[in-house]
Swiss-Prot record:
This is Phospholipase D gamma 1. It is found in: Cytoplasm; Membrane. It is a peripheral membrane protein. Residues 27-163 form the C2 domain. The gene is PLDGAMMA1. The lineage of its organism: Eukaryota, Viridiplantae, Streptophyta, Embryophyta, Tracheophyta.
Length: 858
C-alpha cells in the first residue's frame, strides 16, 4: 500500500488558500498499483460539485459540538432536518500541499458546493487528492479521499464525474459515498495570459481574479531608501531625453502630510512618534512625525493611525514592558493620548471559527505588517484627490538611510537619536549602526483609492466594539465619508479621467489578509468566489500578492530582479523537509522559468538580493532555522536549473550560476582621515572596556551588512511590484501576517508597445538600484539577461565579498556582495571554503536544522 504525503491536517496550519492551506497526510492509498510522477506546471481548473451518501461522523464530537454551538462557526446550512450529522468540506491537495478548500456545509450527508478553483501549480506528483472531511469545533476528521492520477491530467482532457470516496481499507467510506468533481490541467505554454510579457500594452488586464482590479491612469513615484541626496548617484537616461529623477521618500511623505487638508491615515507594523522625516543639516525647524501629526489634527485634518499591537508590550498601571519586537506601540499610543490624533493598537486576532490553539498562534506569532500613508492632495479645479504611499518602510527608528549606507560617520549627525542595531549589543557612541536598504512607492491615481479602501476595511474591523463595549449604541464615525465630501474626487471620477499621457501608469493593489482583519468581506462563504476571495476553514482570504508574483514571473520574458528580506518557499519540492508547509510557489516558479528558457535556448537571468542574515543574532536558533530553509530553497532552485542544462546537453558549456545568482549587501568604512587600517596616519577608535566579543570584532573590522528590508521585484524593466510582503509563508499565505503591495507598469514603456527594450521609469529605477549597489554603471547593465552581464555582475560581487572579508580594512565603493555560499557546476550549494560562518558575529551561513515543528520561521 502506497503512503501518500497528503493528509492529516496539521492544527498549526490555518486557512485554506491556494498554496497556503498547510500540509495534510492520509495514511492510505487512493489508487491501486504504482503511479507515475508528473510535473504539473500551469493551472488546474477545478469544480468541487457535490457529495452523496456521506457517513455521519458525529459521535462524541456531535455532543461536544452541541455544547459549544454558541461559538458560532461560519457555515452554510445544509439539509433542513433536526438530525445532527456531519459538517463536510473538501480540501484539494498536490504534493502534500493544500491548494484549495471548500466552505463547510453544516449538517449534511448530501452537500452541494458547486465551488470553482483556478489554481496555479508547479508541483511534481502522482495524484491530485480530494479529501472529504468533517469539520468539528476541535479539528476535523477524514471521511475519505479521491485521487486523480496526474498522468491522466497531462492528456489535457477534462476529467469529471462521480468518484467513490475511499477510506483506509481502499473501499468506499460508506456504501454509495461519492464525490462529484471536475478537473482539467492546462500547461503553462498553452496559456495565452503568460505569453505576452508582463506589461502587455493598453489591453492588459493585470492580474485576473483579484479583489482589487487593475486601475488605469495616474502616476507612480518609485523610491530607493528613505532618502537620496542630489548628485550622489550616477545619471540614468530614459527614452525621450528624460533623466531619471531619484525620489526623496520621507521628504515627499512629510510634504504630503503638511499639505493634507482633509485626512491623514497611517498603517504600520511600527510607527514611532519621535522619528524625523526630514533631516537637513542644522535645520531646527524640522520637527518630529508626532509633532507634525498633532499640528495637522489641530488644523482640523482627520488623523488616524493604525498600528500593530505587539502582544509582548504592555502599559498597565504605570508599569511598562518594551516588547520583544521593540515596535514602541505603547509609547506612540501614550504620546497621542490627549490629542485629536486617533491611534488604534490593533492585535493580530484569529477568526471567529478558529480553534483556541489556532487563535493563540495567530495572536502570538503573526503581525499586522502593512505600511501605508494615505492623504488628500491638491487636484484640478481647486478640488482634492487621494494619494497613497505603499512599501517596506515603517515610520520608525532605524529606517532612515541613504544609498551611501554609513556605519559610523553619521552617528552624531543624521542618525543622532536614531541608532539601531539589534544584531548584537553595542551603543550609539561606538557603533556600528545597522545600515538599512528599502523600497517604497507613491501612487497618485485611481489605485490610491484601493489603498484607502484597505485602510477603511481594517479600521472598521479594529474599531468594532468588543466585550462590554458592545453595549454602547454609537458606532465608530472616525472615518471620513469621502463620497459625502464634494471637493474630494471620488474613485469613479478618478477612474474615468482620460489619460493619454505616455508617462501614465496602470496600477493594481494586492494584499495578504483574511476576514478576521477586515470588515466588508461577505458573510456568506458562497459569495467568496464572486469577490475573488478564497475559502479557508471558517475564514475568507485575499492572497493576491502571491497571485501577483506568480503571474509576473510566469509572464517574464527576459529577466527577474528581486530584493527581499526573506527568500524561502516551495518546500514541497525540496529534497527533504517537504512537509514544512512553506508552500508558496515563487522559488519554484523562478526555477522553472529559467529551466524552460534553457530548453528553448533563450536568454534569461534572475538576480536575487537578500540580507546577509535575517535581523538578530545569526547564531540564534530561529535565525539558524530560517537560514537552513533558505539554503534548502536555493538548493532546490539550482538543482532544477542543472537538470534542464543536462537535459539539453549544455551542462558542460554553462553552469546554474550563469542563470541564477543570490547576493547580499555589505560595507566597511575606514576611520575619517585614513586610507586603510593597515596604512593609517592615526590610531583607529578603540572599543570601550565593557564591549562584547561581537562588538570588539565589528569595531576592529569596521564592517557590517547593509540590511536588505526591501520587498520588491522588477521584471523585464517593464513591471514593478513593491510592498510590505516578504517571500515566505508568513507574508504570502493570507492567514498569517497582513500585507499590502502595488504592482504597476507604464503601458507606453512595455516590450509589447515598443517592440524593443523599454527605457521608462521602471528601467531607470532598476538601473538606479544597481548604481547604488555596484557604485557605478556600465552599458552592459542595461541588458541583464545577457550572459556577459550575469558574469560581470557576479565577478564584481565576488571582488566586493573578498574586500569585505579581508583582514585589511579599506573603503568600499560597491556594496553588492556575492552571497557567501559555494554553488558547484551541478547545482550543489554548500559552505564557502574557509568561510563557513558569518564574519565577526558567527553563525553557520547555510543554517542548522532543528527538528521543531513551528510556524514562526517560515
Amino acid at each position: 500500500m502506497a503512503y501518500h504525503p497528503a493528509y492529516t491536517e496539521t492544527m498549526s496550519m490555518g486557512g485554506g488558500s491556494s498554496h497556503g492551506g498547510g500540509q495534510q497526510y492520509v495514511p492510505f492509498a487512493t489508487s491501486s498499483g504504482s503511479l507515475r510522477v508528473e510535473l504539473l506546471h500551469g493551472n488546474l481548473d477545478i469544480w468541487v460539485k457535490e457529495a452523496k451518501h456521506l457517513p455521519n461522523m458525529d459521535g462524541f464530537h456531535n455532543r461536544l459540538g452541541g455544547m459549544l454551538s454558541g461559538l458560532g462557526r461560519k457555515k452554510v446550512e445544509g439539509e433542513k432536518s433536526s438530525k445532527i450529522t456531519s459538517d463536510p468540506y473538501v480540501t484539494v491537495s498536490i504534493s502534500g500541499a493544500v491548494i484549495g478548500r471548500t466552505f463547510v456545509i453544516s449538517n449534511s450527508e448530501n452537500p452541494v458546493w458547486m465551488q470553482h478553483f483556478d489554481v496555479p501549480v508547479a508541483h511534481s506528483a502522482a495524484e491530485v487528492h480530494f479529501v472529504v472531511k468533517d469539520s468539528d469545533i476541535i479539528g476535523s476528521q477524514i471521511m475519505g479521499a479521491v485521487g486523480i492520477p496526474t498522468e491522466q491530467l497531462c492528456s489535457g482532457n477534462r476529467i469529471e464525474g462521480l468518484f467513490p470516496i475511499l477510506n483506509s481499507s481502499g473501499k468506499p467510506c460508506k456504501q454509495g459515498a461519492v464525490l462529484g468533481l471536475s478537473i482539467q490541467y492546462t500547461p503553462m505554454e498553452r496559456m495565452r495570459l503568460y505569453q505576452m510579457g508582463v506589461g502587455s500594452g493598453n489591453e492588459c488586464v493585470g492580474v485576473p481574479g483579484t479583489y482589487f482590479p487593475l486601475r488605469k491612469g495616474g502616476r507612480v513615484t518609485l523610491y530607493q531608501d528613505a532618502h537620496v541626496d542630489d548628485g550622489t548617484l550616477p545619471s540614468v537616461h530614459l527614452d525621450g531625453g528624460i533623466q531619471y529623477r531619484h525620489g526623496k521618500c520621507w521628504e515627499d511623505m512629510a510634504d504630503a502630510i503638511r499639505q493634507a487638508r482633509r485626512l491623514i491615515y497611517i498603517t504600520g507594523w511600527s510607527v514611532f512618534h519621535p522619528v524625523r522625516l526630514v533631516r537637513r543639516t542644522n535645520d531646527p525647524t524640522e520637527g518630529t512625525l508626532g509633532e507634525l501629526l498633532k499640528v495637522k489634527s489641530q488644523e482640523g485634518v482627520r488623523v488616524l493611525v493604525l498600528v500593530w499591537d505587539d502582544p509582548t508590550s504592555r502599559s498597565l498601571l504605570g508599569f511598562k514592558t518594551q516588547g520583544v519586537m521593540n515596535t514602541s506601540d505603547e509609547e506612540t499610543r501614550r504620546f497621542f493620548k490627549h490629542s485629536s490624533v486617533q491611534v488604534l493598537l490593533c492585535p493580530r486576532s484569529g477568526g471567529k471559527g478558529h480553534s483556541f490553539i489556532k487563535k493563540s498562534e495567530v495572536g502570538t506569532i503573526y503581525t499586522h505588517h502593512q505600511k501605508t500613508v494615505i492623504v488628500d492632495a491638491e487636484a484640478a479645479q481647486n478640488r482634492r484627490k487621494i494619494v497613497a504611499f505603499v512599501g517596506g518602510l515603517d515610520l520608525c527608528n532605524g529606517r532612515f538611510d541613504t544609498p551611501k549606507h554609513p556605519l559610523f560617520r553619521t552617528l552624531k549627525t543624521l542618525h543622532k537619536d536614531d541608532f539601531h542595531n539589534p544584531n548584537f549589543v553595542t551603543t550609539a557612541d561606538d557603533g556600528p549602526r545597522e545600515p538599512w536598504h528599502d523600497l517604497h512607492s507613491k501612487i497618485d491615481g485611481p489605485a490610491a483609492y484601493d489603498v484607502l479602501a484597505n485602510f477603511e476595511e481594517r479600521w472598521m474591523k479594529a474599531s468594532k466594539p468588543r466585550g462590554i463595549g458592545k453595549l454602547k449604541s454609537s458606532s465608530d464615525d472616525s472615518l471620513l465619508r469621502i463620497d459625502r465630501i464634494p471637493d474630494i474626487v471620488g474613485l469613479s471620477e478618478a477612474s474615468s479621467a482620460n489619460d493619454n499621457d505616455p508617462e501614465s501608469w496602470h496600477v493594481q493593489v494586492f494584499r495578504s489578509i483574511d476576514s478576521s482583519s477586515v470588515k466588508g468581506f461577505p458573510k456568506d462563504p458562497k459569495e467568496a468566489t464572486g469577490r475573488n476571495l478564497l475559502c479557508g476553514k471558517n475564514i475568507l482570504i485575499d492572497m493576491s500578492i502571491h497571485a501577483a508574483y506568480v503571474k509576473a514571473i510566469r509572464s517574464a520574458q527576459h529577466f527577474i530582479y528581486i530584493e527581499n528580506q526573506y527568500f524561502l518557499g516551495s518546500s514541497f519540492n525540496w529534497d527533504s523537509n517537504k512537509d514544512l508547509g512553506a508552500n508558496n510557489l515563487i522559488p519554484m516558479e523562478i526555477a522553472l522559468k529559467i529551466a524552460n528558457k534553457i530548453r528553448a535556448r533563450e536568454k534569461f537571468a534572475a538576480y536575487i538580493v537578500i540580507p546577509m542574515w535575517p535581523e538578530g543574532a545569526p547564531t540564534s536558533n530561529p535565525i539558524q532555522r530560517i537560514l537552513y530553509w533558505q539554503h534548502k530553497t536555493m538548493q532546490m532552485m539550482y538543482q532544477t536549473i542543472y537538470k534542464a542544462l543536462v537535459e539539453v546537453g549544455l551542462d558542460s558549456q554553462f553552469e546554474p550560476q550563469d542563470f541564477l545568482n543570490f547576493f547580499c549587501l555589505g560595507t566597511r568604512e575606514v576611520p575619517v582621515g585614513t586610507v586603510s587600517v593597515y596604512n593609517s596616519p592615526r590610531k583607529p577608535p578603540q572599543p570601550n572596556a565593557n564591549a562584547n566579543a561581537a562588538q570588539v570584532q565589528a569595531l576592529k573590522s569596521r564592517r557590517f551588512m547593509i540590511y536588505v528590508h526591501s520587498k520588491g521585484m522588477v521584471v523585464d524593466d517593464e513591471f514593478v511590484l513593491i510592498g510590505s510582503a516578504n517571500i515566505n509563508q508568513r507574508s504570502l499565505e493570507g492567514t498569517r501576517d497582513t500585507e499590502i503591495a502595488m504592482g504597476g507598469y507604464q503601458p507606453h514603456y512595455s516590450w509589447a508597445m515598443k517592440g524593443s527594450r523599454p527605457h521608462g521609469q521602471i528601467f531607470g529605477y532598476r538601473m538606479s538600484l544597481w548604481a547604488e549597489h555596484l557604485g557605478f554603471l556600465e552599458q552592459g547593465f542595461e541588458e541583464p539577461e545577457n550572459m556577459e552581464c550575469v558574469r560581470r555582475v557576479r565577478q564584481l560581487s565576488e571582488l566586493n565579498w573578498r574586500q569585505y572579508a579581508a583582514e585589511e580594512v579599506t573603503e568600499m565603493s560597491g556594496h553588492l556582495l556575492k552571497y557567501p555560499v559555494q554553488v558547484d557546476r551541478t547545482g550543489k550549494v554548500s559552505s564557502l571554503p574557509g568561510c563557513e560562518t558569518f564574519p565577526d558575529l558567527g553563525g553557520k551561513i547555510i543554517g542548522s536544522f532543528l527538528a521543531l515543528q513551528e510556524n514562526l520561521t517560515i
